[in-house]
């Protein structure tokens, strides 16, 4: 009796990009946006598997696509952030752009970016819709200095100086362990950012991960006998969390697992930031992307492999077989190394719309066990894993 494979099942492919896929953003069960290293953006209609809209949004690789109300926000290595209504440009601003770092929205009206002056630091912008306005409210804040300052205050608190600081550290990271920070001048450049609930997580080149909370004080209204004064206090970032388990490997992937942070690096280790933290090791290195589905991890590796429920799928490059290589020196080991040619994974995301909880499938199970084809069909549009590759192809997979 053969068992059904739990590996992601290919449902369709989307082919139009000529350059490597750099970002994929699902906005509904029917539409996704994709971007590539040339700066092209495509809005896909998944019902017909064709582009509905396409435009040259930037002159270089697009690092981030965000949905902000009715707008689409794009962030590129050409050092600009642009706001679009469909393919019509509504707003543009200069911004620092690094090789990997994305930008994130916070509470839908703040934008967190790498700092313009220093790639290791952070800028925070406040967004307004009507008309679109962007104002910088926090400039060039050093997270490394914020961590050091908070640690100093925590030591003062332990000494009885009355400083009230509450920061969650990884269980392997003790407040009194000075070796964790001694001799280090910085965390390096920002590599990845992710917002979970009210916490902004930032992964650094050093392997450090920091969690921040953006405090937005309420405006204070002061009334006098002849006048009324509105006092606006500026937002500030407060340290909530730090983890050093991935040091010294750069953080290249962050994900949300039911409210818990999951992180991966250039190494083989994935950290689940529960209490206490859990570490999962894989046989492949380069944790390019982490997605979560029904309490399980979907791991995309640099070399193109995708692992889910212990099974791996890959897209091998076409190979010419049976020919005689007159230049071959008979070294089978080198020959095998040269044939290790999978299409490189460059972007991966999971869409969960409509039947994302699987409730419809659960109802059917009370009557009879659904056929595998029915399960795949039910989930192919609502729950889909989208994998973008260096050859410009986007593959749609169903997860069972």
Swiss-Prot record:
This is ASTRA-associated protein 1. InterPro entries: WD40/YVTN_repeat-like_dom_sf, WD40_repeat_dom_sf. WD repeats lie at residues 6-54, 57-94, 240-272, 273-312. It comes from the Eukaryota. It is found in: Nucleus. Component of the ASTRA complex involved in chromatin remodeling. SUPFAM superfamilies: WD40 repeat-like. Keywords: Chromatin regulator, Nucleus, Repeat, WD repeat. GO terms for cellular component: nucleus. The keyword Nucleus applies. It comes from Lodderomyces elongisporus (strain ATCC 11503 / CBS 2605 / JCM 1781 / NBRC 1676 / NRRL YB-4239) (Yeast). Belongs to the WD repeat ASA1 family. Component of the ASTRA chromatin remodeling machinery complex. The gene is ASA1.
């Amino acid at each position: 009796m053969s068992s059904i494979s739990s590996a992601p099942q290919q449902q369709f492919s989307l082919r139009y990009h000529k350059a490597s896929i750099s970002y994929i953003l699902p906005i509904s069960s029917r539409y996704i946006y994709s971007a590539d290293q040339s700066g092209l953006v495509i809005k896909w209609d998944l019902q017909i598997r064709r582009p509905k809209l396409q435009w040259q949004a930037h002159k270089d690789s697009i690092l981030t696509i965000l949905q902000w109300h009715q707008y689409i926000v794009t962030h590129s290595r050409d050092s600009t952030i642009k706001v679009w209504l469909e393919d019509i440009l509504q707003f543009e601003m200069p911004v620092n752009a690094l090789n990997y770092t994305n930008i994130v929205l916070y509470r839908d009206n703040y934008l967190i970016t790498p700092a313009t002056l220093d790639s290791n630091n952070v800028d925070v912008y406040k967004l307004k819709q009507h008309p679109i306005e962007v104002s910088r409210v926090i400039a060039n804040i050093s997270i490394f200095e914020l961590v050091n300052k908070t640690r100093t205050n925590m030591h003062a608190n332990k000494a009885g100086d009355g400083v009230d600081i509450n920061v969650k550290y990884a269980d392997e990271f003790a407040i009194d362990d000075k070796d964790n920070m001694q001799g280090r001048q910085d965390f390096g450049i920002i590599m990845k950012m992710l917002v979970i609930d009210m916490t902004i997580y930032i992964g650094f080149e050093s392997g450090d991960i920091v969690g921040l909370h953006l405090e937005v004080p309420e405006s204070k209204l002061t009334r006098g006998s002849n006048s009324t004064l509105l006092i606006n206090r500026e937002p500030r970032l407060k340290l909530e969390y730090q983890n050093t388990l991935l040091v010294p490997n750069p953080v290249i992937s962050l994900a949300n697992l039911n409210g818990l942070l999951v992180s991966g690096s250039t190494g083989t280790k994935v950290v689940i930031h529960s209490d206490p933290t859990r570490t999962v090791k894989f046989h492949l290195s380069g944790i390019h992307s982490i997605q979560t589905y029904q309490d399980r991890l979907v791991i995309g590796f640099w070399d193109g492999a995708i692992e889910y429920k212990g099974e791996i799928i890959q897209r091998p490059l076409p190979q010419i077989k049976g020919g005689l290589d007159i230049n071959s020196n008979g070294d089978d080991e080198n020959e095998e190394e040269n044939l290790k040619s999978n299409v490189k994974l460059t972007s991966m995301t999971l869409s969960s719309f409509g039947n994302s909880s699987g409730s419809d499938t659960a109802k059917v199970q009370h009557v009879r066990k659904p056929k595998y084809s029915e399960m795949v069909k039910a989930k192919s549009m609502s729950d889909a894993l989208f994998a973008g590759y260096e050859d410009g192809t986007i593959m749609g997979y169903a997860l069972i």
